[in-house]
């Protein structure tokens, strides 16, 4: 008997075959990182930024669609005004621990830039 396939599988399913697009896989990547960190007893947060006009333009839209899943795992998405500012924002989000201001064990980041 085959299990029902749900549209939410792309972000909720943890094993077996998962049907998703390449951009949805990039959205899933930080969700997986958060789960791996939790398995290793790390209380991390995530920060994603990038330029809406980047060559991977649909990424911001897909992140917005997945906002519920990002919020559940303390992953924040903030579009950048340009690629450089997006990358700088990710770097800045990771600096809290250096000044003893962080509320997490660390922040993993993702910034899409066109090289």
What are the functions of these language-model segments?
Residues 1-113:
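Thiamine diphosphate
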